[in-house]
């Protein structure tokens, strides 16, 4: 991942479309492209089987949040650090980490919701 000056996002938040999100993932986290493609295929299959767009909507929301975080190197590092603590820390540390991860995800979803308005 490349860095940006003064803590600015590496790229603007893309529109919440499959094409735009794929391009953004390729820029901010190319190693995640196989997971993106696999999860898109799974969501499309579920949508077809159930004649329901909800799986694709969940996919887009999930990856929009992923891009929102990954395009901000410090935020992405904070999330990775808290994920490590949650996986390897004591019960008390894991509880704190879960709280911090929740705050990051809540702020991410709030920012994405505000941008849609």
Role assignments for model-derived ranges:
Residues 77-117:
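Amphipathic alpha-helical binding modules
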């Amino acid at each position: 991942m490349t860095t940006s000056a003064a803590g600015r996002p590496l790229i603007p938040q893309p529109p919440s479309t499959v094409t735009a999100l794929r391009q953004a993932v390729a820029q901010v986290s190319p190693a995640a492209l196989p997971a993106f493609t696999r999860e898109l295929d799974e969501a499309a299959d579920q949508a077809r089987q159930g004649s329901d767009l909800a799986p694709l909507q969940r996919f887009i929301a999930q990856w929009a949040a992923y891009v929102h975080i990954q395009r901000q190197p410090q935020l992405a590092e904070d999330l990775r650090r808290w994920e490590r603590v949650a996986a390897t820390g004591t019960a008390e540390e894991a509880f704190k980490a879960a709280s911090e991860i929740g705050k990051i995800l809540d702020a991410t979803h709030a920012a994405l919701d505000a941008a849609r308005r």
